[in-house]
Amino acid sequence: MPSVDIDASQWQKLTQSREKQTTVITPLGMMMLEIQGELELPKDFASLARRDSPNEGRFSEQDGETLIRFGSLQIDGERATLFVGKKQRLLGKVTKLDVPMGIMHFNSKDNKVELVDVMKYKVIFKDRPLPIM
């Protein structure tokens, strides 16, 4: 069976220093979002990305890929609110994962795997989006 070594040096650096910038996007670390349904992206997002102003910041580029910021996540204890655009919001609940999940970066060029972060929580959005009035 094929195998590959996993480099955990990045994870060790993150756990040894609180000052290092990480992939963590919430006070609870990197989180999984579980939503009902689909997020619909604009069909012409490439042209929208070219016209995006720095003030809006909806689009960015990383490793040659266009990334779309579709919302803003706010966490208050065990409750979470995801604002999607300027018209909808989702209300959700923060739950701890039974088994933490590792976030890995696979580099196919040199056949290496790097442990980037460990996810311990997820946010579950069970209901349909609510309109913002």
Curated annotation (Swiss-Prot):
One of its GO terms (cellular component) is Ctf18 RFC-like complex. The keyword Aminoacyl-tRNA synthetase does not apply. It comes from the Eukaryota. Component of the CTF18-RFC complex, which consists of CTF18, CTF8, DSCC1, RFC2, RFC3, RFC4 and RFC5. It is found in: Nucleus. One of its GO terms (molecular function) is DNA binding. One of its GO terms (biological process) is DNA replication. Keywords: Cell cycle, DNA replication, DNA-binding, Nucleus. Belongs to the CTF8 family. It comes from Saccharomyces cerevisiae (strain ATCC 204508 / S288c) (Baker's yeast). Pfam families: Ctf8. Coiled coil: none annotated. This is Chromosome transmission fidelity protein 8. The lineage of its organism: Eukaryota, Fungi, Dikarya, Ascomycota, Saccharomycotina. The gene is CTF8. Essential for the fidelity of chromosome transmission. Required for the DNA replication block checkpoint. Component of the RFC-like complex CTF18-RFC which is required for efficient establishment of chromosome cohesion during S-phase and may load or unload POL30/PCNA. During a clamp loading circle, the RFC:clamp complex binds to DNA and the recognition of the double-stranded/single-stranded junction stimulates ATP hydrolysis by RFC. The complex presumably provides bipartite ATP sites in which one subunit supplies a catalytic site for hydrolysis of ATP bound to the neighboring subunit.
